A protein has these predicted regions:
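Basic, Lys/Arg- and aromatic-enriched nucleic-acid-binding interface segment
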Residues: 2-60, 151
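Exposed loop/turn and edge beta-strand positions of beta-sandwich/beta-sheet ligand-binding modules
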Residues: 40, 70, 89, 110, ...
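Conserved tyrosine-mediated DNA breakage-rejoining catalytic core shared by Y-recombinases
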Residues: 9, 59-102
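Short, polar N-cap/turn motifs at the start of nucleic acid-interacting alpha helices
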Residues: 1, 65-71, 144, 163-184
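Hydrophobic (often cysteine-bearing) scaffold residues that line and stabilize catalytic clefts
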Residues: 39-40, 126, 130, 134, ...
Length: 200
Protein backbone atom coordinates (compact mmCIF):
# COMPACT_ATOMS: atom_id res chain seq x y z
CA UNK A 1 0.00 0.00 0.00
CA UNK A 2 1.46 3.41 -0.99
CA UNK A 3 2.56 5.69 1.81
CA UNK A 4 1.14 9.15 1.04
CA UNK A 5 3.81 11.04 3.00
CA UNK A 6 6.82 8.92 1.99
CA UNK A 7 8.33 11.75 -0.07
CA UNK A 8 7.53 14.52 2.38
CA UNK A 9 10.52 16.10 4.12
CA UNK A 10 10.01 17.20 7.71
CA UNK A 11 12.77 19.26 9.28
CA UNK A 12 13.90 18.20 12.75
CA UNK A 13 11.97 20.03 15.46
CA UNK A 14 15.11 21.51 17.02
CA UNK A 15 16.85 22.32 13.74
CA UNK A 16 18.17 25.89 13.72
CA UNK A 17 18.46 27.67 10.39
CA UNK A 18 21.74 29.51 10.15
CA UNK A 19 21.42 33.09 9.04
CA UNK A 20 22.83 34.34 5.77
CA UNK A 21 24.53 37.72 5.41
CA UNK A 22 22.88 40.39 3.28
CA UNK A 23 24.57 41.45 0.06
CA UNK A 24 25.05 44.94 1.47
CA UNK A 25 26.84 43.61 4.54
CA UNK A 26 28.97 41.27 2.43
CA UNK A 27 30.15 44.15 0.24
CA UNK A 28 30.87 46.29 3.29
CA UNK A 29 32.88 43.56 5.03
CA UNK A 30 34.75 42.75 1.81
CA UNK A 31 35.88 46.36 1.44
CA UNK A 32 37.10 46.44 5.05
CA UNK A 33 38.97 43.17 4.53
CA UNK A 34 40.71 44.30 1.35
CA UNK A 35 41.62 47.65 2.91
CA UNK A 36 43.14 45.98 6.00
CA UNK A 37 44.69 43.21 3.89
CA UNK A 38 46.11 41.16 6.76
CA UNK A 39 46.00 37.37 6.87
CA UNK A 40 42.69 36.99 8.71
CA UNK A 41 40.85 39.62 6.69
CA UNK A 42 42.12 38.21 3.38
CA UNK A 43 40.86 34.81 4.51
CA UNK A 44 37.39 36.29 5.08
CA UNK A 45 37.46 37.93 1.64
CA UNK A 46 38.48 34.64 0.04
CA UNK A 47 35.66 32.70 1.71
CA UNK A 48 33.06 35.38 0.98
CA UNK A 49 33.13 34.94 -2.81
CA UNK A 50 34.05 31.24 -3.05
CA UNK A 51 31.67 29.66 -0.54
CA UNK A 52 34.45 27.48 0.83
CA UNK A 53 34.30 25.96 4.28
CA UNK A 54 36.84 27.51 6.65
CA UNK A 55 38.88 24.29 6.81
CA UNK A 56 38.95 24.08 3.01
CA UNK A 57 40.42 27.56 2.72
CA UNK A 58 42.89 27.13 5.58
CA UNK A 59 44.39 24.01 4.00
CA UNK A 60 45.23 25.63 0.66
CA UNK A 61 48.75 25.71 -0.73
CA UNK A 62 49.98 27.74 -3.67
CA UNK A 63 50.03 24.68 -5.89
CA UNK A 64 46.23 24.70 -5.57
CA UNK A 65 45.99 28.21 -7.02
CA UNK A 66 45.89 29.02 -10.75
CA UNK A 67 46.04 32.81 -11.03
CA UNK A 68 47.48 32.92 -14.55
CA UNK A 69 44.84 30.63 -16.06
CA UNK A 70 42.32 31.99 -18.58
CA UNK A 71 39.82 31.46 -15.78
CA UNK A 72 41.67 32.00 -12.48
CA UNK A 73 40.62 29.34 -10.02
CA UNK A 74 41.31 27.09 -7.05
CA UNK A 75 41.73 23.35 -7.50
CA UNK A 76 40.41 22.19 -4.15
CA UNK A 77 41.78 18.78 -3.29
CA UNK A 78 42.56 16.73 -0.20
CA UNK A 79 45.91 17.11 1.57
CA UNK A 80 47.53 15.15 4.42
CA UNK A 81 47.12 18.17 6.72
CA UNK A 82 43.51 18.82 5.63
CA UNK A 83 41.13 16.14 4.36
CA UNK A 84 37.92 17.15 2.61
CA UNK A 85 34.49 16.57 4.13
CA UNK A 86 33.01 14.56 1.24
CA UNK A 87 34.00 13.23 -2.17
CA UNK A 88 31.97 16.05 -3.73
CA UNK A 89 34.05 18.62 -1.87
CA UNK A 90 36.87 18.11 -4.35
CA UNK A 91 36.15 20.72 -6.99
CA UNK A 92 37.28 23.67 -9.10
CA UNK A 93 36.30 27.07 -7.75
CA UNK A 94 36.63 30.16 -9.98
CA UNK A 95 38.31 33.16 -8.39
CA UNK A 96 36.18 36.25 -8.86
CA UNK A 97 35.41 39.46 -7.00
CA UNK A 98 36.87 39.93 -3.53
CA UNK A 99 38.25 36.38 -3.51
CA UNK A 100 40.35 37.08 -6.61
CA UNK A 101 41.61 40.38 -5.20
CA UNK A 102 42.51 38.73 -1.89
CA UNK A 103 44.49 35.94 -3.54
CA UNK A 104 46.41 38.45 -5.68
CA UNK A 105 47.44 40.34 -2.54
CA UNK A 106 48.46 37.13 -0.76
CA UNK A 107 50.41 35.98 -3.81
CA UNK A 108 52.54 39.14 -3.71
CA UNK A 109 53.16 38.60 0.03
CA UNK A 110 53.70 34.82 -0.01
CA UNK A 111 56.59 33.42 2.06
CA UNK A 112 55.68 29.72 2.37
CA UNK A 113 53.80 26.95 0.51
CA UNK A 114 50.68 27.55 2.64
CA UNK A 115 48.36 30.49 2.05
CA UNK A 116 47.58 30.81 5.76
CA UNK A 117 50.79 30.10 7.65
CA UNK A 118 49.49 31.24 11.04
CA UNK A 119 46.95 28.43 11.15
CA UNK A 120 48.29 25.67 8.90
CA UNK A 121 51.42 23.58 8.56
CA UNK A 122 52.28 20.07 7.45
CA UNK A 123 50.84 18.69 10.69
CA UNK A 124 47.35 20.14 10.31
CA UNK A 125 45.05 23.16 10.43
CA UNK A 126 44.06 25.00 13.60
CA UNK A 127 40.53 25.71 12.46
CA UNK A 128 38.98 26.14 15.91
CA UNK A 129 41.31 28.95 16.90
CA UNK A 130 40.84 30.66 13.57
CA UNK A 131 37.05 30.34 13.65
CA UNK A 132 36.82 31.87 17.11
CA UNK A 133 38.98 34.84 16.12
CA UNK A 134 37.09 35.49 12.88
CA UNK A 135 33.66 35.17 14.48
CA UNK A 136 34.60 37.66 17.20
CA UNK A 137 35.84 40.15 14.63
CA UNK A 138 32.90 39.68 12.25
CA UNK A 139 30.30 40.32 14.96
CA UNK A 140 31.55 43.91 15.24
CA UNK A 141 30.19 44.53 11.75
CA UNK A 142 27.40 41.93 11.38
CA UNK A 143 26.24 40.99 14.90
CA UNK A 144 24.19 37.90 13.97
CA UNK A 145 26.75 36.40 11.59
CA UNK A 146 29.51 33.83 11.92
CA UNK A 147 32.16 32.96 9.37
CA UNK A 148 30.11 30.00 8.09
CA UNK A 149 27.29 32.43 7.24
CA UNK A 150 29.22 33.38 4.11
CA UNK A 151 28.75 29.83 2.83
CA UNK A 152 24.98 30.05 3.32
CA UNK A 153 24.96 33.45 1.62
CA UNK A 154 27.01 32.04 -1.27
CA UNK A 155 24.21 29.62 -2.08
CA UNK A 156 21.52 32.30 -1.71
CA UNK A 157 23.40 34.74 -3.95
CA UNK A 158 23.84 32.15 -6.68
CA UNK A 159 20.18 31.16 -6.48
CA UNK A 160 19.07 34.79 -6.67
CA UNK A 161 21.34 35.30 -9.68
CA UNK A 162 19.46 32.55 -11.51
CA UNK A 163 22.19 29.89 -11.39
CA UNK A 164 20.75 26.40 -11.72
CA UNK A 165 20.77 24.22 -8.61
CA UNK A 166 23.03 21.54 -10.11
CA UNK A 167 25.76 24.11 -10.75
CA UNK A 168 25.30 25.61 -7.29
CA UNK A 169 25.86 22.17 -5.77
CA UNK A 170 29.03 21.73 -7.82
CA UNK A 171 30.44 25.15 -6.91
CA UNK A 172 29.83 24.67 -3.20
CA UNK A 173 30.72 21.00 -2.99
CA UNK A 174 27.25 20.13 -1.73
CA UNK A 175 25.89 16.62 -2.19
CA UNK A 176 23.99 16.11 -5.43
CA UNK A 177 20.25 15.93 -4.96
CA UNK A 178 19.49 13.39 -7.69
CA UNK A 179 20.93 10.24 -9.21
CA UNK A 180 21.17 11.88 -12.63
CA UNK A 181 23.50 14.57 -11.37
CA UNK A 182 26.06 11.89 -10.58
CA UNK A 183 26.65 11.15 -14.27
CA UNK A 184 29.15 13.00 -16.47
CA UNK A 185 32.01 15.27 -15.47
CA UNK A 186 29.98 18.27 -14.39
CA UNK A 187 30.21 21.84 -15.63
CA UNK A 188 33.45 23.07 -17.16
CA UNK A 189 35.53 25.88 -15.67
CA UNK A 190 34.34 28.46 -18.18
CA UNK A 191 30.68 27.82 -17.35
CA UNK A 192 31.40 27.93 -13.63
CA UNK A 193 33.31 31.19 -13.93
CA UNK A 194 30.62 32.89 -16.02
CA UNK A 195 27.91 31.85 -13.57
CA UNK A 196 29.87 32.89 -10.49
CA UNK A 197 30.46 36.36 -11.92
CA UNK A 198 26.70 36.91 -12.01
CA UNK A 199 26.59 37.87 -8.34
CA UNK A 200 29.63 40.16 -8.32
Amino acid sequence: MPKPFARTYLAPVNEVKRASISTEDIKRVQKICLDMADERRLLVALISDTGMRLSEALGLIWDDIYLDHEYPHISLTTHPWRPLKTAGSKRLIPLVGAAYEAVKIMHRQRTAPFLFNSYTNANGCNGNSCSAALNKWLKKYVPDAVIHSFRHSFRDRLRNAGVQSEMIDQLGGWSNQSVGQGYGEGFNLRSLSVSLKRFI
